[in-house]
Amino acid sequence: MTERFDCHHCNESLYGKKYILKEENPHCVACFEELYANTCEECGTPIGCDCKDLSYKDRHWHEGCFHCSRCGSSLVDKPFAAKEEQLLCTDCYSNEYSSKCQECKKTIMPGTRKMEYKGSSWHETCFTCQRCQQPIGTKSFIPKENQNFCVPCYEKQYALQCVQCKKPITTGGVTYREQPWHKECFVCTACKKQLSGQRFTARDEFPYCLTCFCDLYAKKCAGCTNPISGLGGTKYISFEERQWHNDCFNCKKCSLSLVGRGFLTERDDILCPDCGKDI
């Protein structure tokens, strides 16, 4: 007796018929398609064994149903894009959804690298420095009057040049006599200490810290021999080409302050009228 060879589902004999194995169990074509065939997203009918089953993200189509939702062109073996569960050819997707390049006004195709800034988009090769025309890419840039500049070009064209080192001032800076300086370049002419944020004065247009200015140029007190800066409201007495701090202008003998008083001189000394009686 011949061994039976039947469909695992309907038990119909498979001798002389097409069959399909599923987990090593034979099925007739009709049962296999009923039980296991995927349903086409487009037409809603099973995708039979004699048809190509095209799939995308767990969705399936007959080969003839796999087309653009807008223009109907076939997407078989062509690039496509998905938008809200619909499949679109690249032309239809670009026309409806792709951004336009701010520079060349052409569509930025899906999958193409693009640059975005403040709501505008560029092809990567179109996002260039206004001055040198080189692509900016992921490098730093500076916008100026609706134009974009790479940092070196911006500094050459717009940044102030330090009067001392002649290099661009990109941050901060100091203005002295209407000329720009880097903070680190604006230093005392004598000791080279930075003057930014410090009190300073000038001699022949050269800046000096107060200490160096006093040491170099200030008059010396005839009493204590220390410099009289004359800065910041410092008061002093001047008499016959000699100067004294107010606190140092005292009688040589009794140390009485002579500020606002009459006095006498004895050689290099100054005396109050009472001490001067003995001269």
Swiss-Prot record:
Tell me a Gene Ontology molecular-function term this record carries: zinc ion binding
- Residues of crosslink Glycyl lysine isopeptide (Lys-Gly) (interchain with G-Cter in SUMO2)? 78, 167, 220
Which residue range or ranges hold the LIM zinc-binding domain? 40-92, 101-153, 162-212, 221-275
Tissues expressed in? Highly expressed in heart but also detectable in brain and skeletal muscle.
Task: Copy out the induction comment.
Answer: Up-regulated in hearts exposed to isoproterenol (at protein level).
Alphabetical UniProt keywords: Cytoplasm, Isopeptide bond, LIM domain, Metal-binding, Nucleus, Phosphoprotein, Repeat, Transcription, Transcription regulation, Ubl conjugation, Zinc, Zinc-finger
List residue spans of C4-type Zn fingers. 7-31
Q: Which GO terms describe its biological process?
A: atrial cardiac muscle cell development; heart trabecula formation; negative regulation of apoptotic process; negative regulation of calcineurin-NFAT signaling cascade; negative regulation of transcription by RNA polymerase II; osteoblast differentiation; regulation of transcription by RNA polymerase II; response to hormone
Localization terms from the record: Cytoplasm; Nucleus; Cytoplasm, Myofibril, Sarcomere, Z line
Q: Which GO terms describe its cellular component?
A: nucleus; Z disc
Q: Which residues carry this modification: Phosphoserine?
A: 238
**Coiled-coil boundaries:** none
Describe its assembly: Interacts with ZNF638 and TTN/titin. Interacts with E4F1. Interacts with GRB7. Interacts with SIRT1 and FOXO1. Interacts with CEFIP. Interacts with calcineurin. Interacts with FOXK1.
The Swiss-Prot or TrEMBL note on domains reads: The third LIM zinc-binding mediates interaction with E4F1.
Role according to the record: May function as a molecular transmitter linking various signaling pathways to transcriptional regulation. Negatively regulates the transcriptional repressor E4F1 and may function in cell growth. Inhibits the transcriptional activity of FOXO1 and its apoptotic function by enhancing the interaction of FOXO1 with SIRT1 and FOXO1 deacetylation. Negatively regulates the calcineurin/NFAT signaling pathway in cardiomyocytes.
Protein name (record): Four and a half LIM domains protein 2
Originating species? Mus musculus (Mouse)
- Gene assigned in the entry: Fhl2
